Amino acid sequence: MTLNITSKQMDITPAIREHLEERLAKLGKWQTQLISPHFVLNKVPNGFSVEASIGTPLGNLLASATSDDMYKAINEVEEKLERQLNKLQHKSESRRADERLKDSFEN
C-alpha cells in the first residue's frame, strides 16, 4: 500500500510520516482493503489542517481536522476515519435488522 502525503507551506519530517503510517496501520484492524490513502497537510493561520481521503471496497472515507498541534490533528483525522469505517462495515447488518422488524410488524 502506497501512502501519498501532500504538504502545503510546510515540510514533511520523517517523524510526521512515521506517525501517519502508525495511525493508518491502526485502521488495519477492520480487515478491509485501503485503496490509495492520501493525506494533505496544511499550515493555516490558527495551526495545522489535515485532510484525508481513502478508498475502500465499501466506499470512500473523507475526513479533516484542524488543530494547533499537527500530531493532534492527525489523531483526530484517524479517529474520524475509524468511525466512518465502522459505520460502513456494519451498515448491511443494521439494514438486515430493519427488514426483520418490518416483517414482524406486518404479520
Swiss-Prot record:
Gene Ontology MF terms: ribosomal small subunit binding
Top-rank taxon: Bacteria
GO biological process: negative regulation of translational elongation
Keyword Transcription: no
Induction notes from the record: By environmental stress and during stationary phase.
Keywords assigned by UniProt, alphabetized: Stress response, Translation regulation
Region (Disordered): 85-107
Functional note: During stationary phase, prevents 70S dimer formation, probably in order to regulate translation efficiency during transition between the exponential and the stationary phases. In addition, during environmental stress such as cold shock or excessive cell density at stationary phase, stabilizes the 70S ribosome against dissociation, inhibits translation initiation and increase translation accuracy. When normal growth conditions are restored, is quickly released from the ribosome.
Protein name as it appears in the record: Ribosome-associated factor Y
Gene name of the encoded protein: yfiA
